């Protein structure tokens, strides 16, 4: 349930078109009168397991809405996330981000809303990853007891692709994690202080453990003699790989010149072990992300207590002198990213193409 809005303007149309198939799979599509009522209905789906007369072990729920709809539904997200999901249910919250305000009165970036609601979220970079991350997101929601956000942009959700579904039968790894007595899932007669304790002390850490076990964040390119690393996510990652191709840099060239690339699938909370291992031995980390800095702030915080002699320089929206590198007031493009990468590489690698 949810409410339509670009770039998710066609989602409900496709669900209506697939109504016969959905009914056969016992999937109910009930669009909301508005975003918050849709989110409330999805929250209600997690209560099924609490009913002793329930006919199902659990129900998974998907909420959808564009950026301003997330603003409207924040109270529901906060309460639903704090209450928790069902162990056999789970909730995926799909948000359409219009970074360039192409069909909105203001640009929108859902990252900070999800963080404020303490909702872990995933950022797919391709049509294929909508399937992969969607399945991972529901499994993460069941494991960690949280709602899981899911960023959709026009560059991914309003495109088409051929996806080989045979590769989606991957085994999802359930990590070892020490949960509190009684677990972290929804329960009857809960006390709000206890809800908040589970949220603050366990759920986010459980999400990070799940992300680490399932390789949601990963090294894409490595180098035996690393000097500079690029960290990116979602649409910006796809643009970054295109920019590197325009510069004539592939995995072999990157390994030779000391360039590493790290793809973040879960921008918040940023899983610390993987990103720290990636940053070891680097002179510089360039963070490429849409709109305001988000991963960049988390990375700087995680590396802050490293000794200065081993801590890499971290740049993104600004360079080390405070000058703009990747401005937040427009959408990024492969061309803009290519210029920034070329400028950061020229100190130790330059070619006619660059």
List where the protein language model places each region.
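Thiamine diphosphate
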Residues: 1-127, 153-155, 224-227, 231, ...
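Flexible, low-complexity linker and terminal segments
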Residues: 124-354
């Amino acid at each position: 349930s949810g409410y339509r809005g670009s770039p998710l303007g066609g989602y409900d149309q496709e669900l209506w078109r697939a109504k016969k198939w959905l009914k056969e799979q016992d999937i109910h599509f009930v669009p909301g009168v508005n975003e918050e009522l849709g989110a409330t209905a999805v929250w209600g789906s997690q209560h099924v397991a609490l009913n002793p007369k329930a006919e199902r072990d659990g129900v998974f729920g998907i909420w959808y809405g564009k950026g301003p709809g997330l603003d409207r539904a924040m109270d529901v997200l906060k309460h639903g996330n704090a209450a928790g999901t069902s162990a056999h249910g789970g909730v995926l919250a799909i948000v359409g981000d219009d970074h360039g305000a192409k069909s909105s009165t203001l640009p929108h970036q859902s990252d900070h809303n999800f963080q404020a609601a303490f909702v872990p979220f995933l950022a797919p970079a391709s049509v294929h990853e909508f399937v992969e991350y969607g399945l991972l997101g529901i499994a993460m929601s069941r494991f960690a007891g949280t709602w899981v956000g899911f960023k959709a942009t026009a560059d991914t959700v309003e495109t088409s692709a051929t996806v080989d579904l045979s590769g989606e039968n991957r085994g999802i790894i359930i990590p070892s994690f020490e949960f509190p007595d009684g677990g972290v899932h929804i329960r009857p007669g809960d006390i709000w202080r206890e809800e908040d304790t589970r949220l603050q002390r366990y759920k986010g850490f459980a999400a990070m453990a799940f992300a680490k076990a399932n390789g949601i964040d990963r090294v894409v390119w490595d180098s035996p003699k690393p000097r500079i690393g690029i960290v990116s996510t979602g649409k910006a990652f796809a643009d970054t790989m295109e920019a590197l191709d325009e510069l004539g840099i592939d995995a072999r060239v990157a390994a030779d010149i000391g360039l590493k690339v790290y793809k973040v699938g879960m921008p918040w909370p940023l899983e610390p072990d993987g990103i720290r291992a990636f940053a070891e031995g680097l002179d510089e980390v360039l963070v490429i992300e849409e709109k305001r800095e988000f991963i960049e702030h988390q990375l700087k915080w995680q590396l802050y207590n490293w000794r200065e002699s081993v801590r890499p320089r971290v740049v993104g929206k600004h360079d080390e002198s405070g000058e703009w590198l990747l401005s937040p007031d427009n959408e990024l493009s492969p061309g803009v990213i290519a210029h920034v990468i070329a400028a950061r590489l020229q100190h130790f690698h330059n070619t006619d193409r660059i």
